Swiss-Prot record:
Known role: In parasitic nematodes PEPCK carboxylates phosphoenolpyruvate to oxaloacetate thus introducing the products of glycolysis to mitochondrial metabolism. Catalyzes the conversion of oxaloacetate (OAA) to phosphoenolpyruvate (PEP), the rate-limiting step in the metabolic pathway that produces glucose from lactate and other precursors derived from the citric acid cycle.
Name recorded for this polypeptide: Phosphoenolpyruvate carboxykinase [GTP]
Record-linked PROSITE patterns: PEPCK_GTP
Active site: C306
Gene Ontology cellular component list: cytosol
Binding annotation for Mn(2+): K262, H282, D329
Catalysis performed (reactions): oxaloacetate + GTP = phosphoenolpyruvate + GDP + CO2
């Protein structure tokens, strides 16, 4: 079946005057930028998609400040952005309340073979690590959406680099979008503009093709809420990994529209990494310097709401320690010529969850967004300041009038929320006071430790070290976290989130684990793998560990293990835990070490049974035998544990 949306132009199917004229005699003016200077294959991509989506004009972005000022002025005039007058160049955006988050149920991988994308799950079991759609079905979905979808709107051409422009680990993308909000956010989140096009001409021309539309051609058929066009009923976010292509329709929200982020930097990048021998992971990267002046680099993978950004920007409570951030969300990692694992942060900004962020929980994040930042779905005070849950004690006037994220009057103490729980700040990473001087080093920084973790209210000790690289992969595959459950459930439940990658898997998870195992073979010098749990609770539901800046005490122990100190750990069935007295607890009141580090036999036996069921249901026959052996061996070790 021929799919109109996926058909390609030949070089003579279009011509350029001061406009793009396609072979079907559609004339589309280029209102900014020099179309002729684009590489020919980029011209072809832009022309064929312009023919498909029928924009009224083409705008080639250069990433300059003048361009940003022009777009911001337009957005303010239309009411899309509201200036937060208490700051320099900070703006607030309120979205349609139906378009506020990533939409996992509408996110797809498109491959000819289903099990390239998802695992062989038993009949009747829905895979939770990715969704597959056939190319034929996808073609129909595209043709039901994209033809003519940009009518009456400008199509922006965004050339961008994930990673420093021209770097050995960096990759280029070009996003076509009809949203100027997306342009402004991509300018913060990626390296964007003319330098990318110059690099593209040098690097044999490879780029990831990204197509995004809000899905509301003009004249719009439905009412636009908050000046935010979207089409939630027809939203789709789809990836064609073999073709290095992303299609997104109907949503303007960051994770669905800033296609360099999760779509490219994780789902597509992990496919490129599989082909080229590297890894794309949902991990922070931080540099930690000891009082002796020794610096090591750590990568850490936590599910959402487990403190990744807080750890990346940690303010140590122990004198002499220093933490500097490379990245807070995504790591691209490749083994270097010396055998060590090197990581870059492919992003250029922070796209952080606002609620809960405060000077108490993360002062460095707060310092990062005092200017040049776009806030989405937070509240605004009458004084022109941002506000969200967690800032109640930082407001100068607690009785100040506010407008909440829905555009309604609001005051502290009201039952409704001031900010949406998934409200965001989009801020330049370079504004963070503790950004590492090497954060843009093209070859990356050497990783000594990989840390997994999640919210585990019971049973799981504060920290343990895996027994080996393969056991560490097993530990990562077992990551679970307490999450506020979906609407059809009540209360909270602990949910699986393997490697903190469950929502972002770009191919079969069994193959993903085998990729990790393959990369761990000699001559590669693999980092040590650890698991942390800041969130263990006592019987009366109080946290056993203070967390935040005191987490440096655990990082200290981890780094001493990386230095080869064998005297500070003791072996347990699940890995190596700190010997009593080897974590610095000075100044901490009433830490119940025994409860914090205990490994309850009954809990862990039950956990292994549940994990086995999870692997059987969600990984099935794709589970590597080595991981099955780790599960079996750990179960036997736990059985031998004395009560």
């Amino acid at each position: 079946m021929r799919c109109r949306s996926l058909s390609h132009f030949k070089d003579d199917d279009f011509a350029v005057v001061s406009e793009v004229v396609t072979h079907k005699q559609n004339h589309i003016p280029v209102i900014k930028g020099d179309f002729v200077s684009l590489p020919k294959h980029v011209q072809r991509f832009v022309a064929e998609k312009a023919e498909l989506m029928k924009p009224s004009a083409i705008f080639i972005c250069d990433g300059s400040q003048n361009e940003a000022d022009e777009l911001i002025a337009r957005c303010v005039e239309r009411g899309v952005l509201v200036p937060l007058k208490a700051y320099k160049n900070n703006y607030l955006c309120r979205t349609d309340p139906r378009d506020v988050a990533r939409v996992e149920s509408k996110t797809w991988m498109i491959t000819p073979e289903k099990y390239d994308s998802v695992c062989h799950t038993p009949e009747g079991v829905k895979p939770m690590m990715g969704q597959w759609m056939s190319p034929d079905e996808f073609g129909k979905e595209l043709d039901d959406r994209f033809p003519g979808c940009m009518a009456g709107r400008t199509m922006y051409v965004i050339p961008y680099s994930m990673g420093p422009v021209g770097g050995p680990l960096s990759k280029i993308g070009i996003e076509l979008t009809d949203s100027d909000y997306v342009v402004l956010c991509m300018r913060i989140m990626t390296r964007m503009g003319e330098p990318v096009l110059k690099a593209l001409a040098k690097n044999n021309g490879e780029f990831v093709r990204c197509v995004h539309s809000v899905g509301q051609p003009k004249p719009v058929a439905t009412k636009v809420i908050n000046h935010w066009p979207c089409n939630p009923e027809k939203t789709i976010i789809a990836h064609r990994p073999a073709e290095r292509e992303i299609w997104s329709f109907g949503s303007g929200y960051g994770g669905n529209s800033l296609l360099g982020k999760k779509c490219f930097a994780l789902r597509i990048a992990m496919n490129i990494g599989y082909d080229e021998g590297w890894m794309a992971e949902h991990m922070l990267i931080m540099g930690v310097t000891s009082p002796k002046g020794e610096e090591r680099f750590v990568a850490a993978a936590f599910p959402s709401a487990c403190g990744k950004t807080n750890l990346a920007m940690l303010e140590p409570t122990i004198p002499g320690w220093k933490v500097r951030v490379i990245g807070d969300d995504i790591a691209w990692m490749k083994f270097g010529a010396d055998g060590r694992l090197y990581a870059i942060n492919p992003e250029y900004g922070f796209f952080g969850v606002a609620p809960g962020t405060s000077h108490k929980t993360n002062p460095m994040a707060m310092a990062s967004f005092q200017e040049n930042t776009i806030f989405t779905n937070v509240a605004e005070t009458a004084d022109g300041e941002y506000f969200w849950e967690g800032l109640e004690h930082e407001v100068k006037n607690p009785k100040v009038d506010m407008i909440n994220w829905l555009g309604e009057p609001w005051h502290i103490g009201d039952e409704s929320k001031a900010a949406h729980p998934n409200s965001r700040f989009t801020a330049p990473a370079g504004q963070c006071p503790i950004i590492h001087p090497d954060w843009e080093k093209p070859e990356g920084v050497p990783i000594d430790a990989i840390i997994f973790g999640g919210r585990r209210p019971e049973g799981v000790p504060l920290v343990f070290e895996s027994r080996s690289w393969v056991h560490g992969i097993f530990v990562g595959a077992c990551v679970k976290s307490e999450a506020t459950a979906a609407a059809e459930h009540t209360g909270k439940q602990v949910m699986h989130d393997p490697m903190a990658m469950r929502p972002f898997m770009g191919y079969n998870f069994g193959r993903y684990m085998r990729h990790w195992m393959k990369l761990g073979q000699p001559p590669h010098k693999v980092p040590k793998i650890f698991h942390v749990n800041w969130f263990r609770q006592s019987a009366d539901h109080k946290f056993l560990w203070p967390g935040y800046g005191d987490n440096i005490r655990v990082i200290d122990w981890i780094l001493r293990r990386c230095s080869g100190d064998a005297t500070i750990a003791e072996e347990t069935p699940i890995g190596f835990i700190p010997k009593k007295g080897t974590i610095n607890l000075e100044g901490l009141p009433n830490v119940n070490w025994d409860e914090l580090m205990s490994i309850p036999k009954s809990y862990w036996l039950e956990d292994m049974v549940e994990t086995k069921t999870f692997f059987e249901n969600q990984v099935g026959s794709d589970l590597p035998p080595e991981i099955a052996k780790e599960l079996e061996a750990q179960t036997e070790r736990i059985k031998a544990l004395k009560e």
